[in-house]
Amino acid sequence: XYNLLTIEDIDVKGKRVLVR
């Protein structure tokens, strides 16, 4: 997922990124 209200671990082009 992707949720702007939560910190979620998403896979972008094979890289693990932290989205806040």
UniProtKB/Swiss-Prot annotation:
What further fact does the record state? On the 2D-gel the determined pI of this protein is: 5.6, its MW is: 56.2 kDa.
**Gene Ontology, cellular component aspect:** cytoplasm
- Transferase is among the record's keywords: yes
State any single GO MF term: phosphoglycerate kinase activity
The subcellular location is: Cytoplasm
The record's subunit annotation is: Monomer.
**UniProt-listed GO biological process terms:** glycolytic process
Q: Does the keyword Nucleotide-binding apply?
A: yes
Pathway where this protein functions:
Carbohydrate degradation; glycolysis; pyruvate from D-glyceraldehyde 3-phosphate: step 2/5
Task: Give its E.C. classification number.
Answer: 2.7.2.3
Top-level enzyme category: transferase
- Homology family: Belongs to the phosphoglycerate kinase family.
Keyword set for this entry? ATP-binding, Cytoplasm, Glycolysis, Kinase, Nucleotide-binding, Transferase
Reaction it catalyzes? (2R)-3-phosphoglycerate + ATP = (2R)-3-phospho-glyceroyl phosphate + ADP
Protein's name in the database: Putative phosphoglycerate kinase
